[in-house]
Amino acid sequence: MPPVCGRRCSRTGEVRRYPGSFVRKWKRVETANGPRFRSVVAPHEVALLKHLVGALLGLLNERESSSPLDELEVITGIKAGNAQRPEDPTLRRLLPDFYTPDDKDQLDPAALDAVDSLNAALRSLHEPEIVDAKRSAAQQLLDTLPESDGRLELTEASANAWIAAVNDLRLALGVILEIDRPAPERVPAGHPLSVHFDVYQWLTVLQEYLVLALMAT
């Protein structure tokens, strides 16, 4: 398979866990205004990230718009979240229950109702903040992408936003691929989801290299 990010160069590292895959590393540069994290993106990478992040933002906006109108929100300005568990499996992965007891399968109906009520209350209180944080990270990723291709330069704050947004993209793709921990290293050649899995691998290593750059001193 050709390098995911194009022709191999000095800034392109082999993804050893995924033979034949390549991804450009991030370079940490110390400046008077704090560290900067630099890399290069190809046109198809920019287009792919824009498409994936756009779909993610659409899901989050749809979830937010599904929240019922709360009279207290109108009075206090405090946003209330949707108390119901998302029906969409991708949103359920992005916005899981706040509390799941270890012995849930052994609980009686009354105890299960109590767990559901607790999760509903926690969703109503905290989900808007979580959705806003995910949306903000995704938007920062979009805002720092070049128009088509070229150099990337991230501040420490925007690098952390990239890590959060890319992680959400991986979670969303993981639902399509039915990936649970630990993720498989590869899928058979010719598998109908092999392209999606290649993208999942690329996002995983992109995130890993950026984390390593942030940790470097």
Curated annotation (Swiss-Prot):
InterPro entries: AosR
UniProt motif CXXXC: location: 5-9
Key words, A-Z: Disulfide bond, Redox-active center, Stress response, Transcription, Transcription regulation
Domain of life: Bacteria
Keyword Ribosomal protein: no
Cysteine pairings via disulfide bonds: 5-9
Keyword Disulfide bond: yes
Family to which this protein belongs: Belongs to the AosR family.
Name under which the protein is recorded: Putative oxidative stress regulator AosR
Organism field: Mycobacterium leprae (strain TN)
Gene name per UniProt: aosR
